[in-house]
Protein backbone atom coordinates (compact mmCIF):
# COMPACT_ATOMS: atom_id res chain seq x y z
CA UNK A 1 0.00 0.00 0.00
CA UNK A 2 1.36 3.42 -0.91
CA UNK A 3 1.55 6.45 1.35
CA UNK A 4 -1.45 8.76 1.69
CA UNK A 5 -1.39 11.78 -0.62
CA UNK A 6 -2.48 14.14 2.16
CA UNK A 7 0.55 13.17 4.29
CA UNK A 8 3.06 13.91 1.53
CA UNK A 9 6.35 12.13 0.85
CA UNK A 10 8.66 11.15 3.72
CA UNK A 11 12.08 12.78 3.68
CA UNK A 12 14.45 12.66 6.65
CA UNK A 13 14.35 16.22 8.09
CA UNK A 14 18.13 16.39 8.65
CA UNK A 15 18.82 15.21 5.11
CA UNK A 16 16.40 17.76 3.62
CA UNK A 17 17.94 20.53 5.75
CA UNK A 18 21.44 19.67 4.46
CA UNK A 19 20.20 19.65 0.84
CA UNK A 20 18.46 23.03 1.19
CA UNK A 21 21.55 24.62 2.81
CA UNK A 22 23.78 23.26 0.03
CA UNK A 23 21.38 24.62 -2.61
CA UNK A 24 21.57 28.09 -1.00
CA UNK A 25 25.39 27.99 -0.98
CA UNK A 26 25.41 26.45 -4.48
CA UNK A 27 27.83 23.69 -3.46
CA UNK A 28 27.89 19.99 -4.40
CA UNK A 29 29.34 17.67 -1.77
CA UNK A 30 28.62 13.99 -1.13
CA UNK A 31 26.09 13.60 1.70
CA UNK A 32 26.22 10.39 3.75
CA UNK A 33 22.87 9.02 4.89
CA UNK A 34 21.43 5.92 6.50
CA UNK A 35 17.89 6.98 5.56
CA UNK A 36 17.08 4.50 2.77
CA UNK A 37 13.35 5.15 3.21
CA UNK A 38 13.55 8.84 2.27
CA UNK A 39 11.73 9.80 -0.93
CA UNK A 40 13.73 11.64 -3.58
CA UNK A 41 12.34 15.17 -4.00
CA UNK A 42 13.16 17.73 -6.76
CA UNK A 43 15.49 19.68 -4.42
CA UNK A 44 17.88 16.69 -4.44
CA UNK A 45 18.40 16.65 -8.23
CA UNK A 46 22.06 17.17 -9.12
CA UNK A 47 23.43 16.08 -5.74
CA UNK A 48 25.34 12.91 -4.90
CA UNK A 49 24.03 11.09 -1.84
CA UNK A 50 25.95 8.18 -0.28
CA UNK A 51 23.25 5.68 0.76
CA UNK A 52 24.17 2.97 3.30
CA UNK A 53 23.65 -0.60 2.06
CA UNK A 54 24.41 -2.35 5.35
CA UNK A 55 28.20 -2.38 5.13
CA UNK A 56 29.28 0.65 3.08
CA UNK A 57 27.91 3.86 1.58
CA UNK A 58 27.02 3.62 -2.12
CA UNK A 59 27.25 6.98 -3.97
CA UNK A 60 24.04 7.73 -5.89
CA UNK A 61 23.88 10.69 -8.31
CA UNK A 62 20.30 12.01 -8.30
CA UNK A 63 18.67 12.73 -11.68
CA UNK A 64 15.19 13.99 -12.59
CA UNK A 65 14.04 10.47 -13.49
CA UNK A 66 14.61 9.35 -9.87
CA UNK A 67 12.17 11.85 -8.32
CA UNK A 68 9.43 10.03 -6.42
CA UNK A 69 11.50 6.89 -5.79
CA UNK A 70 13.16 5.92 -2.49
CA UNK A 71 16.91 6.27 -1.91
CA UNK A 72 17.20 2.61 -0.93
CA UNK A 73 16.11 1.48 -4.40
CA UNK A 74 19.47 2.59 -5.81
CA UNK A 75 21.72 0.92 -3.21
CA UNK A 76 21.22 -2.88 -3.39
CA UNK A 77 21.73 -4.73 -0.10
CA UNK A 78 22.25 -8.22 -1.47
CA UNK A 79 24.85 -9.57 -3.88
CA UNK A 80 23.83 -12.33 -6.29
CA UNK A 81 26.68 -14.73 -6.95
CA UNK A 82 24.84 -17.04 -9.36
CA UNK A 83 23.29 -20.46 -9.03
CA UNK A 84 25.27 -23.65 -8.58
CA UNK A 85 26.75 -25.03 -11.80
CA UNK A 86 25.38 -28.16 -13.42
CA UNK A 87 27.11 -31.51 -12.85
CA UNK A 88 28.16 -31.65 -16.49
CA UNK A 89 30.41 -28.62 -16.15
CA UNK A 90 31.85 -29.50 -12.74
CA UNK A 91 32.46 -33.19 -13.44
CA UNK A 92 35.91 -34.12 -14.75
CA UNK A 93 35.90 -36.68 -17.59
Curated annotation (Swiss-Prot):
Alphabetically list the UniProt keywords.
Answer: Ribonucleoprotein, Ribosomal protein, RNA-binding, rRNA-binding
Q: Which Pfam families match?
A: Ribosomal_S19
Name the InterPro entries for this protein: Ribosomal_uS19 (IPR002222), Ribosomal_uS19_bac-type (IPR005732), Ribosomal_uS19_CS (IPR020934), Ribosomal_uS19_SF (IPR023575)
Q: Which GO terms describe its cellular component?
A: cytoplasm; small ribosomal subunit
Keyword presence, rRNA-binding: yes
- Can you provide one Gene Ontology molecular function annotated for this UniProt record? rRNA binding
> Record keywords: Ribonucleoprotein included?
yes
Please provide the Gene Ontology terms (biological process) for this protein: ribosomal small subunit assembly; translation
Taxonomic superkingdom: Bacteria
Function (record text): Protein S19 forms a complex with S13 that binds strongly to the 16S ribosomal RNA.
The family classification in the record reads: Belongs to the universal ribosomal protein uS19 family.
Tell me the protein's name: Small ribosomal subunit protein uS19
**To which species is this protein native?**
Caldanaerobacter subterraneus subsp. tengcongensis (strain DSM 15242 / JCM 11007 / NBRC 100824 / MB4) (Thermoanaerobacter tengcongensis)
The opening ranks of the lineage are: Bacteria, Bacillati, Bacillota, Clostridia, Thermoanaerobacterales
Q: Gene name, please?
A: rpsS
